[in-house]
């Protein structure tokens, strides 16, 4: 019985070691591929579209604000037949950024008080 238990522990140890080595090999291959893409310049992102500018040419090109990425919002202006798309920040994300800024400022004051 002790022999079976010892054999089982050794088998599990060997299996976990071999699977960890395989994962390391996969990670190394991914890193090499990423480095080659960066060297070629293929991974470089194109320029983003600023807030309130037209994003109809590429709806995923809106810039990031401090915490969140702006969203390309499309609508029909009153009395118009053409769809207009602009990069905008949703209100709930705007409020979350304001709350985060206030919390950051308050944390700075507390740090200043208690040094």
From Swiss-Prot:
This is U3-lycotoxin-Ls1a. InterPro entries: Spider_toxin_CSTX_Knottin_CS. Residues 21-44 form a propeptide. It comes from the Eukaryota. It comes from Lycosa singoriensis. GO terms for molecular function: toxin activity. The keyword Lyase does not apply. GO terms for cellular component: extracellular region. Expressed by the venom gland.
């Amino acid at each position: 019985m002790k022999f079976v238990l010892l054999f089982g522990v050794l088998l599990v140890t060997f299996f976990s070691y071999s699977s960890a080595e395989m994962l390391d090999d996969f990670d190394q291959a991914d890193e090499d591929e990423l480095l080659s893409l960066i060297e070629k310049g293929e991974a470089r992102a194109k320029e983003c579209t600023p807030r309130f500018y037209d994003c109809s040419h590429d709806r995923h090109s809106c810039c990031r604000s401090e915490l969140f990425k702006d969203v390309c919002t499309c609508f029909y202006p009153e009395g118009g037949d053409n769809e207009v798309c602009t990069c905008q920040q949703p209100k709930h994300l705007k409020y979350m950024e304001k709350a985060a800024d206030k919390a950051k400022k308050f944390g700075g004051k507390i740090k200043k008080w208690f040094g």
